[in-house]
Amino acid sequence: MHKLVTGRILILPLIAAALCAGSLLPAQISTVAFQPSKLSPEQQGDLFMARKMFREAIEAYREAPQTSAIVWDKMGIAYHQLGDLAAAKKHYEKAIKIDPKYSDAINNVGTILYSQKNYRGAIARYNRALAIAPGAASIWSNLGTAYYARGKYPEMSQAYAKAIQLDPAVFDSHNALGTTMQDRSVGDKARYHYEMARIYASAGNKELALQYLRKSLEEGFKDKDKIGKAPEFDAWRDTQEFKDLIALEPRVL
């Protein structure tokens, strides 16, 4: 099931990329009065999206140039937010037909396939998008999530590490507008949070590593021997903070 959060799809599934040329920037949206008649149709749609008025956004985007892959992608995102995955996919594919190298739309089709548990298909789309836009942190994070769903933990770690390298805040961004959807829903949350702890530990981010490690324990991760032997935690293993965390017997959420 898709749960959409501003900036991403949290499947744990978000609208995460910056707005493209010709669209309103988030800072503008916070200061511009709601006067649709003074805006272009695409800008009107962006403003409706920021206000979570998705049906109105779709109507506004339909008045924008229909030769724009970006507009079709944004309509797809609006349908995605409404939970109409069939319509969302149709609009993403139209965007790709207009611009076969539009990585955002290719990624967004991947998020549809992910929600349908077609993880192989999702991975193929994400890799295709990354071949075009290798610097897109949100797509790397989507790839990692899909690998996790298939139980491919080393591949997940590599993809997530790349995402964090490109954007250290990739898992915490809350951009209200954009053209890229980001997946974040997983099954085994305890194992997921443990893997996230290892990834952040490898990146040297102690605060987030221990935060995710605590979450994994709260979600029921029981293999403390695995935690104790994981080389990613070697730098902190003898600290009192780490010892106290491992000694905890938290109430499972």
Where in the sequence are the language-model features?
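Canonical tetratricopeptide repeat
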Residues: 74-77, 81, 108, 142, ...
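Structural marker of alpha-solenoid helical repeat scaffolds
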Residues: 64-67, 98, 132, 166, ...
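Terminal, low-structured helical/coil segments at or just beyond the last alpha-helical repeat
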Residues: 28-38, 178-183, 187-190, 208, ...
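Structural signature of tandem alpha-helical TPR/SEL1-like repeats
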Residues: 50-59, 81-94, 115-128, 138, ...
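Helix-start (N-cap) detector for alpha-helical repeat units in TPR-like alpha-solenoids
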Residues: 38, 69-72, 103-104, 137-138, ...
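Alpha-helical segment of the N-proximal tetratricopeptide repeat
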Residues: 36-83, 111, 115, 196
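Long, contiguous interaction/recruitment modules in multidomain scaffold/adaptor proteins
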Residues: 2-39, 50
